[in-house]
Amino acid sequence: MPNGGSDCCGTCWFNSENNGEQGYQGSEKKGVAICTIRNLEIPNPFWTYCANHPHKNQNKIDLPLGPVYINDGYPYSRKVWVNPPDNEEIRIKLLELLDKISNQPEFKYPSETVLIEEIIKQLTALKEKRAIDGLKRIINFDIEDYRNQMNFIIRNKSIIVGQAIESLLEITNGEFIDEVEKFINYGIEDNSTVNYYQENDNFAAIRYHLVRGLKHCENPKAKELLMTALKDPHNEVKAFANEILNNKNEC
């Protein structure tokens, strides 16, 4: 059974053993499980995952989206097993899906593999410049409603904004640093750490991804922003800023 998450190949409608339906009906079959959209044999389907699973892909998109992941050990983390294929049809679908990402609240399935995040990650890996306008649109989402959100079954869209920032910087080698520098203190504008709690910082992901994106920027402003991030109250943001700044100073 899928102790690493029920969003696995074992329950997927693209598992050849499930006859086009989602569920556990193929779990007792003795045949080889094949992913019908990737033409990929799945040796351990209940510990293998991708973004095409029905928990995330309710429209049953039958083009491979993102990589295939396998279990990476306790506590149920995942690692890439097979990278996604690349062709123009897939790129067009990714761009279409990018344009459909909205700021509307939505329920989230508790999984490391999230369709809208995989869309951005795959376009980034492809260095797909046609994604630039879509990423800029996401960066301009009004996410103020998520500042104090504590409902953990609602997706925090600030994560998507952060990923779009990092993606934009990586795809363009920092060309849009002037447009995203305003996010370096987003969520901690009052500079007060007296009542700061990391677990309540819903906008830390924005600063985190901005800092990660700065490693792709040769603009001197990148170092200035990293110096600012060294004072960030969130430990991960601060640690990444220190690591990236040290790497830049060694160059």
Indicate where each model-derived feature is located.
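Cysteine-centered metal-binding/redox modules
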Residues: 1-84, 92-95
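Low-complexity, intrinsically disordered Gly/Pro/Thr-rich segments
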Residues: 34-38, 223-231
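Residues that form or flank phosphate/diphosphate-binding pockets in enzymes
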Residues: 45, 175, 221
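Structural detector for internal amphipathic alpha-helices that build alpha-solenoid repeat scaffolds
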Residues: 68-88, 96, 106-128, 137, ...
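Core helices of alpha-solenoid repeat scaffolds
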Residues: 87-91, 132, 177-181, 222-223
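Amphipathic alpha-helical segments within extended alpha-helical solenoids and repeat-rich scaffolds
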Residues: 94-100, 138-147, 180-193
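Short coil/turn segments at helix-helix junctions and helix-capping linkers
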Residues: 232-236
